[in-house]
């Protein structure tokens, strides 16, 4: 038996290995459609990685908060960038940008930007266009995509968008890149680099500032000879710009020039065409190198132009057949005898080189055949074992998911009560899975800022199917607006005091469930963003507050209820924390009814100012509740006056502990919460002290009353940077010295310098 072994070596179909822009088209490279993966999109910084990280900078996409936004504000001296790493070297013909629309919440865009790029073997290069400008005109609003054609185009494997602004401002971007794969020249160098004679300057004015050189010190890069533009007019015409031709004068060059072209890979070349201007080229020598170092003489091809009777200078193409010579570098030496020799473009063309090797091989022996069968059998068994293992793992996971579906009906939770308090929610983990935390002294930090978002059906069932986050899952818009209070979130799960996991299924099953027939639901007494609270009487006369979603199929409200119940189940009963009685058949919450509602409404309704003794007693109740939450490692996360309810005996109760995973009102948030999205017991200490500050003014003066939301964010940054112009609330002198000192320490920028709630509650108890 004879086996014919055929080796087919293909070096590529017929292609032009220089910039042929007309053949490239305007293909989008994948920012919008996802061909460019999230891992390929990075940035120098992000205001918040999840909501406005670089992965959200996709054109025409409303991911998370709608764009990439750098952490600092942008000015003319900034260097913040959005970087896209491509899988290969591409010819980039245009770029397209948008601002941050954020489904109507965004107002940020880049009016100007610069482009940096690199390719294999280069450093970062700042792009300049044919007229020498480096600034690109960007966007004028947040929605309209603006495309900018790159003239000359860019050859790059990585590209950076660098926003710039004359005035310091917040900037956000989305982007797309257009072009095609590049297989042509990656670098060239000329000796000499063009001639300058009197007022005539024909050097390569568009040559890249690549800062890379040959061994002999000649600068390497791309420029006029590979920009895809072929000039037709004479270089001496007055309206002809000198950035279309490179010219060499015979007197300054002795009529000899050398150009070295470099490619990423070895090519088989069929011809090279020189787009030139003059009366004749005396001779051309083309020599090839496959290893990039040696140029063997046997590879050299020489050509000359026929003598012409017409000595008039003209624009013409000079073609040299290259006979499928192989090379990674090509060196062209040109001789000319006219006064000037000009080039505007050099085109290489390569063609497929098919090498067929047919070789007769003797038939294998029986022993060799047996060995081959054994090897094939082992490979087959290995593949079969792997497939069987994967199938078994999938079946186990499916069974596990079914068991969870049958045990857990819905992820639940409560929010605060009172007259129209602010209520925001975040995407919760339906399974109430283990939180990941580290404890440093008495501070509870979340280690992971990512959460798996679990789908919740409209039929009160629970599913462990992971779904990707969308912009509605985040309430952390990076640039603050001046009209409404902003909220900030850190999507992680609260931690259990003992081992970091809730026994959620058992506790939910242990919750008392009341049938609808046993409930008499009355008028509304409060509402949040997705939830509402109504008066309710349970059969037997027990008065409570009925908490439900505003809309039946509101996923966000359902998640909010589920997240709050997780914290309340861990809290158990505490005299200063609102109690959870149970749920109804639809898993709406039945909460302790607190007679006078929110402390702010209570205080505003009081005809006469309340005395300091009453304020101290309220503070004692608050700090008692917060010290208990601290002891079981629950971070409240969004403390404001709306979270303090007044009962019939004029004691305060804290409601809506949500863990470090939820939102805080901007004016009550610690600087690390605003800037770094970090929520701990120490940030709670800041928020509670800010609430006490407002109560000390009878709830008639908001914190930072004179500052806009934008200025509050700037102030938080200034605090973290220890700038002297930063401000903090100044506590009024209505308390004794010890309490005043402790409350003042709550506004320390260094979290470790803030007192614990255990320490804060002591002077109020005394």
Curated annotation (Swiss-Prot):
Keywords: ATP-binding, Cell membrane, Cell projection, Disulfide bond, Glycoprotein, Membrane, Neurogenesis, Nucleotide-binding, Receptor, Repeat, Signal, Transmembrane, Transmembrane helix. Expressed in neurons in head and tail, some motoneurons in ventral nerve cord, in PVP interneurons, pharynx and stomato-intestinal muscle. One of its GO terms (molecular function) is signaling receptor binding. The keyword Acyltransferase does not apply. Glycans are attached at residues 87, 103, 129, 242, 268, 311, 353. Residues 394-766 are cytoplasmic. GO terms for biological process: cell differentiation; cell surface receptor protein tyrosine kinase signaling pathway; motor neuron axon guidance; positive regulation of axon regeneration. Disruption phenotype: Viable. No effect on axon regeneration 24 hours following injury of D-type motor neurons. Double knockout with svh-4 results in a more enhanced axon regeneration defect of D-type motor neurons as compared to the svh-4 single mutant. Residues 519-766 form the Protein kinase domain. The chain crosses the membrane at residues 373-393. Residues 475-501 are annotated as: Disordered. Residues 1-18 form the signal peptide. Residues 488-501 have a biased composition (Polar residues). GO terms for cellular component: axon; perikaryon; plasma membrane. It comes from the Eukaryota. The keyword Disulfide bond applies. Residues 19-372 are extracellular. Disulfide bonds join 24-180. InterPro entries: DDR1-2_DS-like, FA58C, Galactose-bd-like_sf, Kinase-like_dom_sf, Prot_kinase_dom, RTK, Ser-Thr/Tyr_kinase_cat_dom. The protein kinase domain is predicted to be catalytically inactive. Belongs to the protein kinase superfamily. Tyr protein kinase family. Insulin receptor subfamily. This is Discoidin domain-containing receptor A. The gene is ddr-1.
